[in-house]
């Protein structure tokens, strides 16, 4: 066989040198591989569908890659033990959340769930060896899952998230003097670089509480006798802001990134925020979904899976996930329900036995 030009469809034509017969050869496997690679490349880029393949329309691209959405990528666990792992969840919409583990600049694993809870986090954590320290933003159920799955791992709360939550209670311009003093302590939280500065900050927080304890304990009593609550804290939002800082200080999750014992176990400085996973995973994922907006939820989830798989440390080739059932799915057969033969047991017709349909005589007698 020898190449003998191309057909009108662009396929290479082959001709037999002995008998002169001409034919084309279909390489279905390589074609499927090329189509899936094109889809993944489009998802991970800012190109439009018409720009992926020059000379090909967006409609043709969608038709050729329609089967590719059935292919589900999987991240195989490597068993590598990391010094630091950052955990966070991103919501595509209500009841559809993706839990993500991130370490050393790449995705480690992910898990789909309806909402962040201890069970969902535990499923993800059980597939990853326990690291020396984990950086979290305080998501629902995560602390409980860490206590049961990674009991020896140190926990560092994201200081930016704590600072943001405290500011939500105090606002940017607190009206009371204790509120302004607490806001000043809150702003200084992310600027601490040494253990001495951390100790001074904790002393300042304790001093603030002892100085304004009477202010925090002030109560307002209801004047309406029909009120459901007889009294409430007058400065409830300031109390909540202080309790948030005090709780994390008692738990020891504010300044783990400065502890000498932990720094001796790891090879790189420990992060004090979840900025790496926020900027390295969450922001690009939201940008991808914005660039390729308009997809239905199942395709958005598949797009997220492909992006995460492609940003692992050593992503497997995309064609290794292709199975025959992906591009040749079995046709769905709708079962035919036959009507039962015999008298109706329950129907809409009137019968004498019911007593509420046909009535005879005076007053039904």
Regions of interest found by a model, annotated:
Residues 1, 17:
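Cys/His/Pro-rich metal-binding microdomains
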Residues 31-47:
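Short, amphipathic alpha-helical "recognition" segments used to contact nucleic acids or chromatin
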Residues 91, 164, 281-282:
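Short hydrophobic/aromatic residue motifs in ordered secondary structure
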Residues 13, 20, 24-28, 35, ...:
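Acidic/histidine-rich catalytic cores and adjacent linkers
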Residues 48-55, 284:
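DNA-recognition alpha helix
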Residues 15, 22, 54-152:
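RNase H-like nuclease fold core
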Residues 137-187:
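Conserved beta-strand -> loop -> alpha-helix junction used to position metal-binding or nucleic-acid-contacting
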Residues 3-13:
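Short linker/helix segments within small regulatory modules
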């Amino acid at each position: 066989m020898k190449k003998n030009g191309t057909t009108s469809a662009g396929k290479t034509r082959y001709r037999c040198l002995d008998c002169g017969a001409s034919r084309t050869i279909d390489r279905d496997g390589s074609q499927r591989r090329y189509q899936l690679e094109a889809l993944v490349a489009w998802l991970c880029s800012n190109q439009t569908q018409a720009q992926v393949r020059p000379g090909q329309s967006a409609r043709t691209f969608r038709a050729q890659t329609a089967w590719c959405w059935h292919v589900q990528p999987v991240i195989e666990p490597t068993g590598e033990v990391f010094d630091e792992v950052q955990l966070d969840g991103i919501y595509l919409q209500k009841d559809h959340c993706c839990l993500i583990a991130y370490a050393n600049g790449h995705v480690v694993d992910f898990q789909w769930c309806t909402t962040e809870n201890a069970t969902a986090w535990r499923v993800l954590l059980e597939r990853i060896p326990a690291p020396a320290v984990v950086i979290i933003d305080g998501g629902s159920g995560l602390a409980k899952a860490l206590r049961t799955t990674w009991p020896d791992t140190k926990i560092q709360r994201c200081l930016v998230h704590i600072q943001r939550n405290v500011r939500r209670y105090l606002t940017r311009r607190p009206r009371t003097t204790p509120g302004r003093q607490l806001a000043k302590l809150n702003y200084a939280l992310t600027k601490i670089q040494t253990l001495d500065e951390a100790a001074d900050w904790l002393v300042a927080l304790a001093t603030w509480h002892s100085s304004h304890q009477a202010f925090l304990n002030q109560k307002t009593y209801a004047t309406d006798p029909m009120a459901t609550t007889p009294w409430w804290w007058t400065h409830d939002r300031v109390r909540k802001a202080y309790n948030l800082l005090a709780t994390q200080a008692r738990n020891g999750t504010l300044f783990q990134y400065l502890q000498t014992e932990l720094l001796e176990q790891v090879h790189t400085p420990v992060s004090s925020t979840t900025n790496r996973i926020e900027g390295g995973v969450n922001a690009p994922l939201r940008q991808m979904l914005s660039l390729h907006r308009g997809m239905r939820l199942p395709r958005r989830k598949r797009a997220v899976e492909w992006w995460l798989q492609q940003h692992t440390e050593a992503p497997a080739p995309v064609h290794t996930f292709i199975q025959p059932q992906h591009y040749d799915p079995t046709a769905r057969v709708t079962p035919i329900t036959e009507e039962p033969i015999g008298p109706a047991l329950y129907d809409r017709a009137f019968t004498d036995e019911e007593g509420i349909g046909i009535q005879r005589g005076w007053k039904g007698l």
